[in-house]
Amino acid sequence: MNPEYDYLFKLLLIGDSGVGKSCLLLRFADDTYTESYISTIGVDFKIRTVELDGKVIKLQIWDTAGQERFRTITSSYYRGAHGIIVVYDVTDQESFNNVKQWLAEIDRYASENVNKLLVGNKSDLTGKKVVDYQAAKAFADEIGIPFLETSAKNATNVEQAFMTMAAEIKNRMASQPVPPKPGGPVVRPTEGKPINNKSSSCC
């Protein structure tokens, strides 16, 4: 058993380009924010260890590029994910309309029982908001997944979003005494070398 943590969960951030996936990850992992973040090329990841119900959970969070040309690269990351966070921009109706396409990608590539979370980012831009909270909440309720509005800029609900996902995965694992099917994600106290927290960026 690794003494550093009890669980290792792999999370994936997906959604249209420019919705703030990288900013959400920066805020959660490093508690920083930048207006001029460069578009993600391919995939990047960061790690943060959290405590939940007395258990230490290491979250390995993969940030994927939203552009179509990177879709074949990023689709391979779906399979091993325990949780997938679908992000849209509350000031961009099209990014919300495209959520259905991203959910279809999850159905196509991810494990059958993967946990999902819908996040409407940039909630601080109240004057530019076009996606109604109630409409998004109703959509999330209809498909049976949690929903939160966040702001990476002022940190609203960012912590809660990732912790909600961690709790959902942990609860699912606790209610699953049957071992996962071969090829599916396996959550256990992991073997191997501890991952260096100091530098987890790909580039």
From Swiss-Prot:
PANTHER family assigned: RAS-RELATED PROTEIN RAB
This protein's name: GTP-binding protein yptV1
Locus of motif Effector region: 37-45
Functional summary from the UniProt entry: Protein transport. Probably involved in vesicular traffic.
UniProt membrane topology term: Lipid-anchor
Superkingdom to which the source organism belongs: Eukaryota
Subcellular location: Cell membrane
Family listed: Belongs to the small GTPase superfamily. Rab family.
GO cellular-component term (any): plasma membrane
Molecular function as annotated in GO: GTP binding; GTPase activity
InterPro entries linked: P-loop_NTPase, Rab, Small_GTP-bd, Small_GTPase
CDD domains for this protein: Rab1_Ypt1
S-geranylgeranyl cysteine lipid attachment residues: C202, C203
Gene that specifies this protein: YPTV1
